[in-house]
């Protein structure tokens, strides 16, 4: 305790330099802790499920245009076929559709916003999510939903939700048959509060189910204990060839924890860039603390000599500096806590995770590691130097004539600062490129409502007229999908009989000009049986020469005749996915995703 007493006395006398140390360490710790904790959280994604080591996602790789195109979206029957043919290796499988992000649900005339999905009765058992109440087998019936515990509390408070009615988009009533535990923040399903039955999708034809197209499903497979993933993938590859009878699609399983990295939602490259940035910041902060501490050597040399004359040994002096570093870091951590508390909302918005999730028990090792490393560098380096000051220093006049030790530290600081600013500039340039990349259509000032349907053409036309007559609406149109969300999966048959996976969407008659899609040739659709294609579609089909009038088909099913060719535009996330071949068919009713372009100012 005597060491701590002398340490506190020293800190009180040097309060000016200590304030600089606290602010410097506080800011550096805050940034470093946030960077390292966020990357630890990223690497911990989708490990929240029970026995996640046995949980896999079905990966489909399509081969066309002499290129391989991996996707986490697959054909509907894939999971069931795997389960039927590999019963000794597979414990359970499930199929979902992830189309209803930020959808509107109504209970007792109150509106709730949440992500929704469809799933079969094996979903919760396969994913390892606890069911609070209800029988998952109810998901075999149409118009049935399971809701999360949090959403159930918001909708029905203390009432029993089982048997209650919720209405999707004020149009489709469904019955609550169960409650499940909320998805954790490190789940890719986080924010999904509603699980609709897959039977509802079948009833309302929300996607094609078959081997001939409609790759619109996410499928998950839970392996039995002790089963090797590589062995299963070898058998699945042969199975896919037998079922599909073609070599244009490859199916395999990937661990659920690799989902985000495997399919470009996140990348190890960005993780390493941010880890490098965090390491550089941490190193510069530590060196800055060491430099400030050592610069006080001329003031503190005599005091250290006095301590040694009083019986303090090298270990005692070293311990005093460790105490000093610990106290300063304690105040710095209080500053960090103050900053995090006051800037909580913008930080959570930038990090895309709550601070509670960021500093959960699974990730607490990351901030603790930052603190320990900084303590070791900041405490041990100056502590060793000061502990070596001889006792005779009390009888000498200390001069700061030799300043060579400062130059290496200053060089490291300036070099590190230059590196940090250079790396930040690179990240900002990449971010600017991604966020401002030309997508080939105009989405500015466009508001939308999803899942809209009407019972008749007259009702549809009446609602369209009302919407377009609003004083703040400039124009309006509709489509089956939002271009910013990606398009549905579909298949086409080439002239030589080969089946290929492409993207498909329905456009209302005014949608192409509404989104300012440019035509390479031909005209817009104005009747059923007409379709639009993009330039990549023509390259895939080798139809660059005179495409107008050609017939597009999927096996024996005819999609329509080409009347126009659109210039290529982003069909998915332009930052990660190249332009995909697509065609658009005619949507004859004002429904689906209704989009309105608003007048300025809003």
What is each PLM-predicted segment?
Residues 17-31, 271-291, 324-336, 363-371, ...:
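Alpha-helical transmembrane segments of integral membrane proteins
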Residues 1-4, 9-17, 49, 235-280, ...:
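Membrane-helix entry/capping segments
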Residues 34, 240-241, 325-389, 429:
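Small-residue-rich transmembrane alpha-helices
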Residues 43-52, 191-205, 261, 338-365, ...:
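Short juxtamembrane loops and helix-capping segments at transmembrane helix boundaries
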Residues 6, 13-43, 406-430, 441:
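Short, strongly hydrophobic transmembrane alpha-helices
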Residues 5-16, 20, 285-328, 388-399:
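Intracellular coupling helices
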Residues 120-133, 145-266, 465-602:
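Mid-to-C-terminal secondary-structure elements
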Residues 35-102, 203, 212-222, 230-235, ...:
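Membrane-proximal extracellular/periplasmic loop immediately following the first transmembrane helix
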């Amino acid at each position: 305790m005597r060491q701590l007493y002398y340490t506190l006395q020293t800190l009180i006398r040097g309060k000016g330099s200590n304030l600089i140390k606290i602010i410097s360490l506080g800011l550096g710790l805050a940034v470093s802790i946030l960077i390292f904790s966020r990357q630890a959280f990223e690497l911990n994604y989708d490990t929240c499920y029970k026995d996640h080591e046995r949980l896999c996602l079905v990966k489909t790789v399509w081969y066309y245009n002499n290129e391989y195109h991996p996707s986490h979206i697959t054909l509907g029957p894939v999971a069931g076929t795997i389960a039927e043919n590999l019963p000794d290796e597979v414990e359970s499988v499930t199929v979902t559709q992830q189309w209803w992000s930020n959808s509107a649900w109504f209970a007792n005339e109150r509106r709730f916003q949440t992500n929704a999905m469809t799933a079969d009765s094996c979903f919760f058992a396969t994913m390892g999510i606890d069911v609070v109440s209800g029988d998952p087998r109810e998901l075999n019936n149409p118009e049935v939903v399971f809701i999360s515990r949090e959403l159930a509390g918001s909708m029905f408070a203390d009432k029993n939700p089982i048997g209650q009615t919720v209405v999707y988009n004020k149009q489709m009533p469904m019955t609550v048959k169960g409650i499940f535990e909320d998805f954790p923040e490190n789940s890719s399903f986080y924010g999904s509060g509603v699980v609709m039955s897959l039977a509802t999708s079948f009833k309302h034809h929300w996607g094609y189910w078959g081997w001939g197209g409609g790759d619109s499903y996410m499928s998950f497979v839970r392996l039995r204990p002790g089963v090797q993933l590589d062995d299963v993938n070898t058998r699945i590859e042969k199975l896919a060839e037998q079922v599909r009878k073609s070599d244009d699609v490859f199916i395999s399983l990937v661990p659920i924890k690799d989902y985000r990295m495997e399919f470009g939602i996140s990348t190890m490259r960005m993780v390493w860039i941010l880890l490098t940035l965090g390491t550089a910041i941490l190193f510069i902060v530590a060196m800055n603390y060491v430099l400030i501490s050592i610069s006080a050597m001329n003031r503190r040399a005599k005091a250290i000599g006095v301590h040694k004359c009083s019986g303090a040994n090298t270990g005692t002096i070293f311990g005093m500096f460790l105490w000093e570093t610990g106290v300063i870091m304690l105040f710095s951590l209080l500053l960090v806590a103050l900053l995090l508390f006051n800037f909580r909302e913008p930080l959570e918005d930038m990090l895309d995770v709550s601070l509670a999730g960021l500093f959960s028990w699974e990730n607490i090792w990351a901030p603790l590691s930052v603190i320990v490393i900084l303590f070791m560098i900041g405490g041990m380096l100056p502590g060793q130097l000061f502990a070596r000051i001889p006792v005779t220093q009390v009888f000498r006049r200390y001069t700061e004539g030799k300043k060579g030790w400062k130059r290496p530290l200053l060089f490291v600081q300036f070099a590190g600062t230059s590196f940090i600013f250079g790396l930040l500039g690179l990240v900002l340039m990449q971010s600017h490129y991604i966020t401002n990349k030309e997508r080939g259509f105009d989405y500015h000032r466009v508001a939308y409502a999803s899942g809209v349907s009407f019972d008749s053409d007259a009702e549809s036309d009446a609602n369209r007229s009302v919407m377009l007559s609003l004083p703040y609406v400039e124009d309006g149109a509709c489509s089956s999908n939002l271009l910013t969300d990606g398009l549905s999966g579909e298949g086409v048959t080439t002239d030589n009989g080969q089946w290929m996976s492409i993207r498909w969407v329905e456009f209302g008659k005014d949608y192409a000009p509404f989104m300012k899609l440019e035509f390479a040739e031909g005209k817009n659709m104005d009747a059923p049986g007409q379709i639009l294609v993009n330039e990549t579609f023509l390259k895939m089909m080798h139809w660059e020469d005179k495409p107008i009038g050609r017939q597009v088909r999927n096996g024996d099913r005819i999609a329509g005749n080409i009347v126009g060719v659109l210039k290529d535009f982003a069909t998915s996330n332009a930052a990660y996915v190249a332009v995909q071949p697509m065609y658009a068919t005619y949507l004859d009713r004002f429904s689906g995703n209704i989009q309105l372009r608003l007048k300025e100012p809003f």
